[in-house]
Amino acid sequence: QGWKTYWKSPGDGGFAQKMTWDNSTNVKNVNILWPTPIEFEILGLTSLGYENDVIFPLEIELEDEFKNTFLNLHVTYLICKEVCIPGDATVFLEIPSGEKKLTNNYFELEKALSLLPDEDFNSSYVNKINLNTFYDDKDSIIQLIVESEKSFFSPKIFLHSPFGLPVVKNTINYSDDNKIITTNFNFDNDLILDKNFPL
């Protein structure tokens, strides 16, 4: 209990899980699907990730669906509590061609998929997202304006960037009917511009 691992944009500390599948057969691509993270502090650093347990569903794209598949997946990861421990593991999986059948892990997988952020505007009721960036002598600001068919109640908004943005507290302003929110992420220029983060 209490062990943590990291989201795809981990924040100030840690690193996300990384995978390679070089020695696989009939595998074109493997994509990690990331459940909605939580924010936590560890060793004085604010990060985004998961606590105690998490399942990362994998989306595997085959080169030919009518051929047998052998997955040789190498994973590197980091888990933290009072200390951080890096680790690695290799997973082997044979996927025969032919009729598809449900496995004993089907319900666990469905549960994990239900924890993924909804990227479908139609099912999430989000109509529009505008992204703006500003900066002055002190701060660089990423602003999101989100419009929805339904009212927002305590939304959680996380920024993903391949450039390793630090985690900062965002401010949220609501329209009178709570169907439009404006949220600002303010980054200290010393943390952003000096490291050449593109905004």
Regions found by a protein language model. Name each.
Residues Q1-L199:
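Extracellular/lumen-exposed scaffold segments
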